């Protein structure tokens, strides 16, 4: 039997609450029936939670397999200047680093950095140009 601080127990049939005194002062059959209903309700809730967890884990496994295979494809690994990893100096082929999937460059959602570096060093402020 599930007791709470304010002496109220949930009635699974009515989706409401009943005072505990009605069950405690009632006969044994009635209290046994309420206990069985509550335990079956809890079992159903646990089964639903387990099913949701199993579906989530299956979905995550499936998506992990899809992303890992997508990153190993030759077509998506080297995109050249169309890659977000493309840089004419250090990555002219536009290859993705190990463990990352290569994504085509989209100027609307991604902005490439310029060669100029901005730094703020104590009293020095402004743009510093480094030799290439």
Swiss-Prot record:
Biased composition range(s): Basic and acidic residues: 8-20, 27-45
Protein name, as recorded: Altered inheritance of mitochondria protein 4
Domain of life: Eukaryota
Subcellular location: Cytoplasm
Pfam families: NpwBP
Feature: compositional bias, Polar residues: 60-70
Family statement: Belongs to the AIM4 family.
Organism: Candida glabrata (strain ATCC 2001 / BCRC 20586 / JCM 3761 / NBRC 0622 / NRRL Y-65 / CBS 138) (Yeast)
Cellular component GO terms held in the UniProt record: cytoplasm
Region of interest called Disordered, as start-end residue ranges on this chain: 1-103
Alphabetized UniProt keyword annotations: Cytoplasm
Major localisation: cytoplasm
């Amino acid at each position: 039997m599930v007791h709470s601080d304010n002496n109220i127990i949930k009635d699974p049939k009515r989706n409401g609450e009943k005072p505990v005194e009605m069950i405690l002062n009632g006969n044994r059959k009635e209290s046994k029936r309420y206990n069985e209903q509550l335990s079956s309700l809890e079992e159903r809730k646990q089964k639903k939670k387990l099913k949701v967890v199993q579906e989530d884990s299956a979905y995550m496994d499936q998506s992990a397999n899809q992303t890992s295979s997508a990153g190993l494809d030759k077509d998506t690994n080297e995109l050249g200047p169309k890659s977000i990893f493309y840089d004419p100096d250090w990555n002219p082929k536009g290859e993705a680093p190990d463990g990352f999937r290569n994504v085509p460059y989209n100027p609307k959602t991604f902005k490439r950095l310029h060669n100029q570096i901005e730094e703020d060093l104590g009293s020095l402020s402004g743009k510093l140009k480094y030799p290439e």
